[in-house]
Amino acid sequence: YSLSYFLFHFLAMPSSDFDIRILSSDLKFVPVETRMPLKFGTEVLTSVSCARVSLCVRDRNGNESVGWGETPLSVQWVWPSVVPYGERLDALLDFCAKLSGEWSDNGACGHALEIGHSLLFERLPRVLDSYNREERAGLEPIPWLAALVCASPYDLALHDAYGIANNLPTYQCYGEEHCNVDLSAFLEPSEDADVDFSGKHAADILVLNR
């Protein structure tokens, strides 16, 4: 997808006073030693690098907020392979760093669900394809699961920032009041399913334990 298509997607979307726009992102890697070995297939995990992301956003009033997200890059789980562990880890660290620029330079304004969905399912596949073609030419490509995990701390930080920007717990931000579109914009039921996502929002599915 081109940048013009990406921007058109959001320019044509309804908006609200709760919308945010990503300004910048910052990525750090945190080494973690596990308390006990974890086995994934034929490989054993005793340490992991966690990707920690901070995301700065701006609301429609010009106020800025920062959200945080973190996830372990469990190489053995997201990319099972005979390729040496070090090579796979280095590729994931590099790909994570590449995503920082992609998440910062998108121009989208909206709800975290809307921005995140387009980044994950429109931009991420293109970035992954380009990376595998240019950086992994002749080598085993980074799989889709690994790419999603690399993107997940950015998505977590985006949702965290949205809640902070609107002075609400994140899980209270998924109702009709805050979302510009319903779940039918993201989900399509199978042909034999008696399900309609029109008029439904994530808040209708999530159950908060108070």
Where are these regions (language model features)?
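Metal-dependent enolase-superfamily TIM-barrel catalytic cores that perform enediolate-based chemistry
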Residues: 188-210
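Short, Gly/Pro- and small/polar-rich lid/capping loops
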Residues: 14-54
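Metal- or metallocofactor-binding catalytic centers and their adjacent structured scaffolds
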Residues: 65-165, 172, 176-177
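Short beta-strand elements
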Residues: 49-59, 69-73
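Short alpha-helical segments and helix-capping/turn motifs at coil-helix boundaries
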Residues: 37-40, 156-158, 196-203
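Hydrophobic alpha-helical signal peptides and transmembrane signal-/tail-anchor segments
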Residues: 1-10
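Electropositive nucleic-acid engagement tracts
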Residues: 168-196
